[in-house]
Amino acid sequence: MEARLVLGSSSERRKAVLESFRIPFICVSPDFDERSIVYSGDPFKYTKELAWNKANVVRSQGFSDALIITADTVVVYKGEVFNKPESEEHAVEMLRTLSGSSHSVITTLVLMQNEKVLSASENTQVSFIDIPPQHLKTYVRSFSSLKRCGGYCVQDGGGLIIKQIEGCVYNIQGLPIKTLNQLLMEFNISLWDYLV
């Protein structure tokens, strides 16, 4: 019998990616202050710690026997981590910094059920066009930049600023499905069985 599946996330994009399969799940927003974890220079360790803490919070919210999926995604440019912008001005500054260059998008997934905890990370390289300065504010207002690490999105018209992607596009949306499926298979679940 398959475990109840819980996506521990408030991200609409993560939810939408998982909804593209027929796998039954519920979405629970973990009540966790991400600012409580300090970035120490290793984005893989940082995202793993954040995702692990989110999973533990979800487990403590009455889902102790469920299979819990959590994730954390960051943009990394020249060693600096870009999380979700704090304001429109902050989002514009992030995009200005990333304009015309390449950066990494790193997501770490944590799957937790009872005492079994697995994690894996995905790294995608993204290159931006030289974004015309006069379009930065319009972009930020058009694509809910405050809800997205790095202040941008890849879906819909958000991809207008993207020149090239090397790696998993779903990673940029916060839920790399190939990596997720590999971890789910360790719990005897395969996304292949839930294709629409």
From Swiss-Prot:
This is dTTP/UTP pyrophosphatase. One of its GO terms (cellular component) is cytoplasm. CDD domains: Maf (cd00555). It is found in: Cytoplasm. It comes from Chlamydia trachomatis serovar L2 (strain ATCC VR-902B / DSM 19102 / 434/Bu). The keyword Metal-binding does not apply. Keywords: Cytoplasm, Hydrolase, Nucleotide metabolism. GO terms for molecular function: dTTP diphosphatase activity; UTP diphosphatase activity. It catalyses: dTTP + H2O = dTMP + diphosphate + H(+); UTP + H2O = UMP + diphosphate + H(+).
